[in-house]
From Swiss-Prot:
This enzyme's EC code(s): 1.13.11.1
Enzymatic reactions: catechol + O2 = cis,cis-muconate + 2 H(+)
Record-stated family: Belongs to the intradiol ring-cleavage dioxygenase family.
Protein's name in the database: Catechol 1,2-dioxygenase
The keyword Iron belongs to this UniProt entry's keyword annotation: yes
Cofactor note: Binds 1 Fe(3+) ion per subunit.
Annotated coiled-coil segments of the chain: none
Cofactor(s) listed in the protein's UniProt record: Fe(3+)
Binding site for Fe cation: Y152, Y186, H210, H212
GO molecular function per UniProt: catechol 1,2-dioxygenase activity; ferric iron binding
């Protein structure tokens, strides 16, 4: 299914973690204990157990573990990271980040197709500062988001490379002004076992419209986050459980028909 699109990228990254055997044993014990407690609490039957085993096999064979984990688990890992931060709230990265997107000046327009240009423009501006409010010269704002049909470049063959992606270099005061388009809500892929998982519970596969960002500066802790839109559909029932009140934008429409919004990022020291 289409949910496997992020798997090759994840394999290429070869994730590592400096985790001691003792810590791993403690986590594994608690995780398996919690799962066994659920089985006992709900009286899971052998037919249900066999269906679960087959579903686990299907997720692996379908290449959907990155999709499933990023949608249903990553928000808790991000919540652990957030405990140590004083600056801008983070959110999940999701499966569609591509590093080394083209560098763009502090005032710029994201790469887009002619059909993208017909969508309502969004002018997104702000400043990157430290905890004391000092602008961070040359800070990087990596921005990516789906098109109006819910597709991400590099994960949809019909889109040109780097469509609606860029690494914006802030000016000497840490300021930026980026013109892009107003994104739309979209469904996560539903044609594989992740979709079956959602459908079996009468759930929905929708994510509210959002921007993805990674903001960084020398000597500072980078922040990975998402920004949402006030009043947006699905904002109160995000399938990925990733929305936060502090990350909701409220754009205003200008006389020129464009939507304008400002959001400032505050970075913790590294």
């Amino acid at each position: 299914g289409s949910g496997s699109a992020a798997t090759d990228k994840f394999k290429a990254e070869r994730a590592t973690a400096d985790t001691s055997p003792e810590r791993l044993a403690a986590i594994a014990k608690d995780a398996l204990g919690a799962l066994n407690d659920v089985i006992l609490k709900h009286g899971v039957t052998y037919p249900e157990y066999r269906v679960f085993k087959q579903w686990l096999i299907d997720v692996g064979e379908g290449g959907e573990w990155p999709l499933f984990l990023d949608v249903f688990i990553e928000h808790s890992v991000e919540e652990v990271l957030a405990r140590s931060r004083k600056g801008t709230m983070g959110s999940i990265e999701g499966p569609y980040y591509i590093e080394n997107s083209p560098e763009l000046p502090s005032k710029c327009t994201l790469p887009m197709r002619e059909e993208d240009e017909k969508i309502t423009p969004l002018v997104f501006s702000g400043q990157v500062t430290d905890l004391d409010g000092n602008g961070l010269a040359g800070a990087k704002v990596e921005l990516w988001h789906a098109d109006n049909d819910g597709y991400y470049s590099q994960f949809a063959p019909h889109l040109p490379e780097w469509n609606l992606r860029g690494t914006i270099i802030a000016d000497e005061e840490g300021r930026y002004e980026i013109t892009t388009i107003q994104p739309a809500p979209y469904q996560i892929p539903t044609d594989g076992p992740t979709g079956q998982f959602i459908e079996a519970q009468n759930g929905h596969p929708w994510r509210p419209a959002h921007l993805h960002l990674i903001v960084s500066a020398p000597g500072k802790e980078s922040v990975t986050t998402q920004l949402y839109f006030k009043g947006g559909e699905w904002i109160d029932s995000d399938v990925a459980s990733a929305t936060k009140p502090e990350l909701i934008l409220d754009p205003k429409t200008g006389d020129d028909g464009k939507n304008y919004v400002t959001y400032n990022f505050v970075l913790d020291p590294a």
